[in-house]
UniProtKB/Swiss-Prot annotation:
GO terms for biological process, alphabetical: B cell activation
Assembly notes: Interacts with FYB1, which is required for SKAP2 protein stability. Interacts with PTPNS1. Part of a complex consisting of SKAP2, FYB1 and PTPNS1. Part of a complex consisting of SKAP2, FYB1 and LILRB3. Interacts with LAT, GRB2, PTK2B, and PRAM1. May interact with actin. May interact with FYN, HCK and LYN. Interacts with FASLG.
Pfam families xref list: PH, SH3_1
Protein name as annotated: Src kinase-associated phosphoprotein 2
Main location group: cytoplasm
InterPro entries for this protein: PH-like_dom_sf, PH_domain, SH3-like_dom_sf, SH3_domain, SKAP_fam
Keyword Disulfide bond: no
UniProt note: domains: The SH3 domain interacts with FYB1 and PTK2B.
Region spans: Disordered: 67-88
Protein family (similarity comment): Belongs to the SKAP family.
Source taxon at top rank: Eukaryota
Amino acid sequence: MPNPSSTSSPYPLPEEIRNLLADVETFVADILKGENLSKKAKEKRESLIKKIKDVKSIYLQEFRDKGDAEDGEEYDDPFAGPPDTISLASERYDKDDEATSDGAQFPPIAAQDLPFVLKAGYLEKRRKDHSFLGFEWQKRWCALSKTVFYYYGSDKDKQQKGEFAIDGYSVRMNNALRKDGKKDCCFEISAPDKRIYQFTAASPKDAEEWVQQLKFVLQDMESDIIPEDYDERGELYDDVDHPLPISNLPTSSQPIDDEIYEELPEEEEDSAPVKVVEQRKMGQDSVHHTSGDKSTDYANFYQGLWDCTGAFSDELSFKRGDVIYILSKEYNRYGWWVGEMKGAIGLVPKAYIMEMYDI
């Protein structure tokens, strides 16, 4: 029998065989990875790996050509090496295409250390190289941190497998990526002249949530105008990076009785802000603690996300990391709460603070 390693086939590999090998590879390198196998099962696994290696050696040129034509990337052989190195070979296969499409590089960071995570969870990520013998979809723990999309092998990883800045991209649902029961769970992130990233979520609802969160951040990046995101009551949420200044706060959703305020035509532009400030100050006179016992009221302890300097005397100024105790959320609809810090009481932009305790 000729040595497979020295034999090359003049015929292309049939699609049915490619599909079969892909299924076997998935089972051997992915499903059985890390399983506590019996001695007999381990021997069978090694036998299957050897057979796949033999087939690869016969169709080596075709395999390489397909990989180069599709992605222009070098493919890492998942089964290189003797059988006793199978775990290392499988890990090499799991290594994703980590280079970013635009050449930008981000420092390694552990999944648990990502700051300001807006959305996170497990997704199936489509491989850039998903040709013959390659897993088309791989499970990845993904996170949107500020304006960078990271993906990891798991949420315990100390370093990302890849990442990309979403600036300039667009996102949409795409049910044409798969033909199975998950076709309505797919979405893609794309941009002209850049790599397309395609994902499958656990459910259509989860996919929609990813799309909406990405769209919200992208809209915020494209304009200095705060995107309007309404909750069920139709109230406005303030954008994190651009809180509403006092002078631009809406006065009220209800019409204001003209008899309360005297009309001053020459000061018409300033009349609305004065009313809002008066309303805030009147409400602040009756500020009360949100809980009876401050020492155990952990839910109302917050800390500064960024440095904030108050524009008015009734606003608190604080630094990133400062501890603020929230006394009242009376102005929640305007994006402001009433807080106390080091004995001083004042208005705090809620977009500039985060919960101190995870309750």
